[in-house]
A protein has these predicted regions:
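Short amphipathic alpha-helices within nucleic acid-binding modules
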Residues: 65-72
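Vicinal oxygen chelate
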Residues: 1-32, 36-50, 73-119
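Beta-hairpin (beta-strand-turn-beta-strand) motif
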Residues: 61-65, 102-104
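Short hydrophobic/aromatic beta-strand micro-patches
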Residues: 7-9, 59-63
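Short active-site oxyanion
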Residues: 55-57
Length: 119
């Protein structure tokens, strides 16, 4: 398991916003700062649990998402928000945790470039 980012929900606007209409949210590029912070503003009607929309989460890359989810309380089922990435959210001790499986043979380019491909 490898650290990927910290997602912090906010209702405020922030510099370098990236709109992700297919996800009903706006984010910052977590790769553009040394601490992996990703600001996240969820749009009205975004189809996510309140826990994810209101509580910060930590995200980890895993080699095998299915194995990592075994025995966990899954709150967002595995899905592919962008090319080469499959994610799921679990609930651990009352907090959301994001798990990502990344196909490095597909996942090339910057965070912003890859998300723009999915629009």
């Amino acid at each position: 398991m490898k650290f990927n980012h910290i997602g912090i929900p906010t209702t405020d606007r922030f510099d370098g916003e990236i709109d992700l209409p297919h996800l009903s949210m706006t984010v910052s590029d977590h790769q553009s700062n040394p601490f992996g912070i990703q600001w996240q503003r969820y749009w009205d009607g975004a189809p996510y649990p309140d826990l994810v929309k209101t509580v910060p989460h930590v995200a980890f890359e895993v080699d095998n998402l299915a194995e990592a989810l075994a025995g966990q309380e899954v709150i967002i089922a595995p899905n592919s928000p962008s090319q080469g990435v499959t994610v799921a959210f679990i609930k651990v001790a009352g907090a959301p945790v994001e798990l990502l499986e990344i196909d490095r043979s597909v996942r090339k380019g910057s965070f912003e470039q890859l998300h723009r491909l999915c629009r």
